[in-house]
Design a protein with these regions (language model features):
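Short, surface-exposed acidic
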Residues: 75-77, 157-166, 187-193
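C-terminal regulatory or interaction extensions
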Residues: 32, 36, 40-50, 123-129, ...
């Protein structure tokens, strides 16, 4: 819940969530986004969609799929590509390296065009792997913002626009400890997460973006 609400502050559409206290611990209730009044919406994982398109799993390939089959009305396909770039930067900076293609979902519209669904499974993995679960950029899956922005054009962004998107995400992520505690994460858990999210590899990337 804390990670998703932080992502929302970074300009990422997220599923509506609610923490549910249990006898031991807390569960997270997530409102389904593949439902509408009286109907079930057709949803595809990026894993299925990219395989059907003959593409390797990766953020640039997903952006290209949105360019080809995204919702045209109101330039939605462009907005989805821009948001995908923000999601990638957020995953990197929050140390969510379990961002594989089955955790990205596309909603199939009546005209068979595709819309990026709200994010629904976003949290720090705490593994300090240094690489993402999908292809990121010209350096493969390396968890660096520079790597993510190396393919800015795939998201319909200029180098300057992509940097601005990344800087906004970095400003939000920089306040993650205060936000997490405000959302009910214990001080002890926050301190443990800080060992990964605030380790030099990621902290220096945030600082570099904020100074840009």
């Amino acid at each position: 819940h804390a990670s998703l609400t932080l992502a929302a502050l970074a300009g990422i559409r997220v599923a509506t969530t609610r923490p549910v206290p249990l006898a031991r611990g807390t569960a997270l209730a997530i409102e389904r986004f593949d439902r509408a009044p009286g109907q079930r919406l057709h949803a595809l994982s990026a894993h299925v969609a990219l395989r059907a398109a003959g593409s390797e799993p990766g953020y640039p390939a997903l952006a290209q799929l949105l360019r080809r089959r995204g919702v045209l009305a109101h330039g939605q396909w462009q907005q989805d590509k821009h948001e995908l770039c923000r999601r990638l930067v957020f995953h990197i900076l929050i140390d969510n390296t379990d961002d594989h293609e089955k955790k990205h979902v596309l909603l199939v519209q009546d005209n068979q065009q595709l819309r990026l669904s709200p994010a629904f499974d976003v949290l720090p993995t705490g593994q300090a792997l240094g690489y993402q679960s999908m292809h990121v950029g010209k350096e493969g899956a390396v968890s660096s913002v520079d790597n993510a922005l190396s393919m800015a054009a795939m998201y319909g962004l200029s180098a300057r626009e992509a940097l601005d998107e990344a800087r906004h995400v970095a400003r939000v992520v920089d306040g993650w400890p205060v936000h997490f505690i405000a959302q009910g994460v214990s001080a002890e858990a926050t301190a443990l997460l800080a060992d990964q999210i605030d380790r030099p590899f990621l902290r220096e990337q945030r600082r570099s973006l904020l100074a840009a």
